[in-house]
Regions:
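Pyridoxal 5′-phosphate
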Residues: 1-220
């Protein structure tokens, strides 16, 4: 994709928001010119960012800020920074880098080590989650199991997604319902009452999966 875009002079912009909590991102390996992330997806503050591989791009793109005296990234920012949130952003990354207490070295080194272990743990737990949902009555998983991040959306024909999410919340399970999605709309998901979306966090356990399935079973 990167080579095809660059051959015609286009930029490759990768929205890595959904992958960031689960995969170690490398803008060079991806071949992306711009990488988009949002810290709230890994438990950080409500801060989104565009990471540019080449700082010279700042001068090539049309500015958003009307102040034409600005240079660099300030050309694409409006208003003051939320410094408390930026401090929380750093803290959230340090938290991920410290999940494995044996990790040493720079922040990037520790993050690589911790994310490697986290990925293996969550892939095993994801396998358990998918199998548990597949065996639950009235649950239809959306999408394929291969190459999936630990986020799962499903429908329950005859049960509105909002009702299912409310039952999960009442049982201590956090879930989203009816997330706006053209993909879901194209699949006709709204016709089945909408989709429920759940995701695994570093602290998720098999017990959480069991609690999820028990709560869904109570809707049958």
């Amino acid at each position: 994709a990167a080579q095809a875009a660059h051959r015609v002079g286009a930029l490759l912009v990768v929205d890595a928001t959904s992958a960031a909590p689960y995969e170690l991102l490398d803008i060079e390996r991806l071949g992306a010119d711009v990488l988009l992330v949002s810290a709230n997806r890994w438990g950080g503050p409500q801060v989104a960012a565009m990471a540019f591989r080449d700082p010279s791009l700042f001068g090539r793109l049309r500015a958003v800020n009307p102040d034409r005296t600005l240079t660099g990234p300030e050309r694409f920012e409006l208003g003051e920074h939320q410094y408390a949130m930026l401090a929380g952003l750093i803290a959230s990354i340090d938290h991920l880098a410290g999940l494995d207490e044996s990790s040493v070295g720079t922040r990037r080194d520790r993050l690589e080590h911790s994310m490697f272990g986290l990925r293996h743990y969550q892939q095993r737990l994801l396998f358990y989650l998918l199998n548990s949902l597949a065996s639950a009555p009235q649950v239809a998983i959306i999408g394929r199991a291969e190459r999936r991040v630990p986020t799962v959306s499903f429908t329950m024909p005859g049960v509105p997604a909002a009702k299912a999410a409310k039952r999960l919340a009442d049982n201590g399970v956090c879930a989203l319902s009816n997330v706006p999605s053209r993909y879901f709309a194209g699949l006709g998901v709204p016709e089945y009452g909408g989709a429920v979306t759940v995701g695994l966090a570093p602290y998720s356990t098999p017990y959480d999966v069991d609690q999820l399935v028990r709560a869904l079973a109570s809707l049958g």
